[in-house]
UniProtKB/Swiss-Prot annotation:
One GO CC term on file: nucleus
Pfam families reported in the protein's UniProt record: EF-hand_7
InterPro entries registered for this protein in UniProt: Centrin_CML-like, EF-hand-dom_pair, EF_Hand_1_Ca_BS, EF_hand_dom
Induction line: By ecdysone.
Name the record gives this protein: Calcium-binding protein E63-1
Record carries keyword Calcium: yes
Length: 193
C-alpha cells in the first residue's frame, strides 16, 4: 500500500468535519458507508494527537492551524461544545461521527438548495482543488510553498503513515520532479492524482 493512498480522502473527510457549516438544526442524515466510517475514524485519529480517545479544543485548533485555517479560541470552543454531548469539552469518536453526519447533511441540503436556485451542477473539480490545497497546507508546515524532507516526514507521521529513511527517499525521488530537494504544489498534485 502506498504511503499516500487514502490521504486525499482522509483530508477531504476531515475538511468536511472542520470546515462545514455549524450543524445546529435538525437535518435528515444519510447513513455512512463502511468506507466513510473507516475514513472518519482515521480523521478522528488525526485529531486525537495524544491518543486518549477524545478530541480537545487544543487538538482541533492544532489541526485547523495545519490546514492553514486560523480560528479564534472562542469558535474552537463553540465547535467542541456543539459536538460534545457530555458537555465536558471533549469529543469522543461516536460524537465526532454524529457531528460530521449533521454537517454533511447540511452541506447536502445547501447544495440541493443552490442547485435548484441556480440550476448549475456542483463543480467537483473545485472540490478536488480545495482538497489538494488543504492537503498541501498540512504538509507545508511553514507555509513557504514547498514541502521539505522534514515537513514530509513530520506530516506522514501526523497522519499515521511514518516513513523510514528509504521510503522517504523513494517518495522524494518520485515526487521531486525538478530535483531541487523539495516538493512544490504542482509536484504534490501530480503525486496524488
Amino acid at each position: 500500500m502506498s504511503p499516500m493512498s487514502g490521504l486525499r480522502q482522509q483530508l477531504k473527510m476531515l475538511g468536511t468535519a472542520l470546515l462545514g457549516k455549524r450543524a445546529t438544526k435538525s437535518v435528515k442524515k444519510k447513513p455512512f458507508t463502511e468506507v466513510e466510517i473507516k475514513d472518519l475514524r482515521t480523521a478522528f485519529d488525526l485529531l486525537d494527537r495524544n491518543r486518549d480517545g477524545r478530541v480537545t479544543a487544543n487538538e482541533l485548533q492544532f489541526m485547523l492551524k495545519n490546514l492553514g485555517i486560523n480560528v479564534s479560541d472562542e469558535l474552537i470552543h463553540d465547535l467542541i461544545r456543539e459536538a460534545s454531548h457530555s458537555g465536558n469539552g471533549l469529543i469522543n469518536e461516536a460524537e465526532f461521527l454524529q457531528w460530521v453526519g449533521r454537517i454533511q447533511a447540511l452541506r447536502d441540503e445547501q447544495h440541493s438548495h443552490e442547485d435548484s436556485k441556480d440550476s448549475k451542477p456542483v463543480d467537483e473539480a473545485d472540490d478536488v482543488t480545495e482538497d489538494l490545497i488543504a492537503a498541501f497546507r498540512v504538509f507545508d508546515r511553514d507555509g513557504n510553498g514547498f514541502i521539505t524532507r522534514d515537513e514530509l516526514q513530520t506530516a506522514m507521521e501526523m497522519i499515521g503513515e511514518p516513513l523510514n529513511e528509504q521510503q522517504l527517499e523513494q517518495l522524494l525521488v518520485i515526487a521531486d520532479l525538478d530535483q531541487d530537494g523539495r516538493i512544490n504544489y504542482e509536484e504534490f498534485t501530480r503525486l496524488l492524482l
